[in-house]
A protein has these predicted regions:
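Short alpha-helical hairpin
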Residues: 1, 27-31
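Intrinsic disorder at enzyme termini
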Residues: 1-19
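Short hydrophobic motif
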Residues: 15, 22, 26-27, 53
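Solvent-exposed alpha-helix faces
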Residues: 20-23, 85
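Glycine-rich flavin
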Residues: 31-153
Length: 153
């Protein structure tokens, strides 16, 4: 039987240093956060919490500064993500904007869209949602029949 083996690795010192900062922030910010809310962190929307993450530079972390990002490493972003999820923090409000819509705007959006929207995402001010279901397909994106058609208008 084949198996995969991964050697343990260490994160760079700047990423591990960030871990302590994130844990301290979460301990303080979430001290009175009820366990029932923590259990629903994926659907929990807490605008104040999202804005606090944005103020610390923990949203849009890897994005260019010209669009409100912070040009941090993917490993630093990983540390923040790991700690926020482990704490049961409310990520539902900013998750799609920070991890899906924002990167898509950076890659495919117009300059005006990047300037107008991305900085607000990085500040935790915008909440996005995505619809990925229709009758007879559920969340199976490959079976969705709805299509977008570009027009001159």
């Amino acid at each position: 039987m084949q198996s995969l083996h991964f050697e343990p690795c260490e994160l760079p010192p700047e990423a591990e240093a960030l871990r302590g900062e994130v844990r301290e922030f979460l301990a303080e910010t979430m001290a009175d956060y009820p366990m029932a809310k923590r259990a629903k962190s994926w659907v929990g929307i807490d605008r104040d919490f999202s804005e606090k993450l944005g103020a610390r530079g923990w949203l849009g972390m890897t994005w260019p500064k010209q669009y409100g990002g912070h040009e941090r490493s993917m490993l630093e972003r990983y540390v923040v993500l790991e700690e926020v999820l482990a704490a049961g923090a409310p990520v539902g409000g900013h998750w799609v904007a920070d991890r899906q819509s924002g990167p898509l705007l950076l890659k495919f959006g117009t300059e005006k869209q990047r300037q107008l929207i991305c900085a607000r995402i990085a500040r935790g001010e915008l909440i996005f949602a995505i619809g990925m279901s229709e009758p007879d397909s559920g969340s199976d994106l490959a079976s969705i029949r709805t299509r977008a058609v570009k027009t001159d208008g």
